[in-house]
Amino acid sequence: MSHPHRTLIASRRAFLAGTGMTALTALTLAACGANSRSSSGASASAKAGGNLTILTSATDVGWDPAKSQSMPMTSLGLVHRRLTTWKLAPGKPVELAPDLATDTGKASDDGRTWTFTLKKGLKFSDGSAITSAHIKHGVERSFAPALSGGLGYHKSLLAGAEGYQGPYSGAHLSSIETPDESTIVFHLARAFGDWPWIVAQPAFSPVPEGDDPATYSHAPIASGPYQIDQYKQGSSITLKRNPHWSKDTDSIRLALPDTFTFSLGQDETTSAQRLIADSGEDRNAFGADRVSAAQLAQVSANESAKSRLATSPEGGPLAFLAINVQRVSDVNVRKAIAHAVDKAAVVAALGGELGAQAASTYITPGIPGRQSYDLYPHDAAKAKELLTGKTVPALVLLTDNGAASKAMAEAVGQSLKEAGLTVTIEPVEPDTFTERASKGDGSTYDLAIANWNPDYPSANANIQPLFASSEIGSGGSNYARYSNAEVDAAIAQAQANLDAKAAQAQWAALDRKIAEEVPVVPLAYRRNSFLHGSGVAGFFVESYPAYPSYQVIGVSAS
């Protein structure tokens, strides 16, 4: 499981078990205490050149795309390009953009076949040409058991991929065709309108054949503007320019710094203090870890630091309470639980308005097509009314033992107690949480605190993982163990829709339909805050993906 609050990988799995801010306090902070976006704004004040340092608590950064869960705009995107990518700009929603491909794909066969053409003049860092065969090899190697752990949407979508074990034994996928060096064709098992977003994921980075899966993570062949220069285990990683990358083929990556230095294993509190002090080389640095609630209070009291804090305008990842519908089968009891929860108390537990916003929908802010509604506002009297005459056994509330998760669990438990319910909170190690909520049979818990960050900006990435019956057990994230054949069918219909606007309407309707059965209570949208030095420009955070884009950050011209 990835670290809960660093941007090096920035994936939904960073929030799967509900881990959250370190050094958490119940301190309530006012949203006006810091800028909603960094004062750096866009990259107009940045210049080419210099070194940009990234302070991170991570002790390593993996550069093998097959094993990565990263979003396109973070560290992996500096070294590896994909067929498509994300375009981010201050104050604007994320857009899909061509990367190695000339466009975002052409669908045929009613959405079951997708064709991409590569741009001309693409080269690896060793000077060799990038071809469609390298994209195919990159995708195929993601199926190898030795390279597990990366995003795997494509594995269930490509036709004939079931049981495939990768290319290293000589086997290849017939569902990926490369009729020439610049064309790649994907044949899917079913129509999937979000496929252009899927090919922006790490597995669709080109990898030359002959790679060594055991060492590629630390010695990759780059297709992006940077390549690894120095790798010091547990200490630092330095990136230098890839001389064979051409900005003429890449409209997304500004590639401003001459070098990037990843300073590994840094204590988060110490890093924040260094950035607040803003002296020496730290002026040209930023933190990959989210600023904790306690440190947000300190930043808010420091005008200089406050001007260098970037916070997602609206909340990002969803913190939620899953109700195990197999054990809490009475929908009115579930509605009572939803009305009983005081979300303001949950927000306070996460650090106040700078740390979170109260949630009411499953689709998170910044996702296209999201429609706001609130079926279950806090109403203790309504909760008690719904529970009248019912005998509800003591409820087991499962949570991981992270500070934020426990704080949310305490807030939820107190709310339910005030409604007349008996709740036992069980904090466990993250791996134990996964075993019980994700891999077990659901018999050991009634409620579970968790978080979810969608892998890409489509409501499918909010809804399907949490509510499809296929995601119950076996490592899935349907912690509510919710199974509804009509919902499964509606998910499949929305996924197959090639009309993005029409699909968005389907997802919004499905969001509300599921909420009527209350398998999950949305608690809060987590707001992410990141701090940077005064010499850093182009640093901003939007509601989605709620992380800074490494592709446009540079050193200021001052």
Placement of each model-derived feature along the sequence:
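Alpha-helical secondary-structure segments
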Residues: 130-140, 181-188, 224-225, 255-259, ...
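Structural transition elements
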Residues: 352-387, 402-407
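Gly/Pro-rich hinge or "lid" segments in bacterial periplasmic/extracellular proteins
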Residues: 88-89, 171, 182, 187-254, ...
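N-terminal lobe/hinge region of extracytoplasmic solute-binding protein
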Residues: 55-109, 221
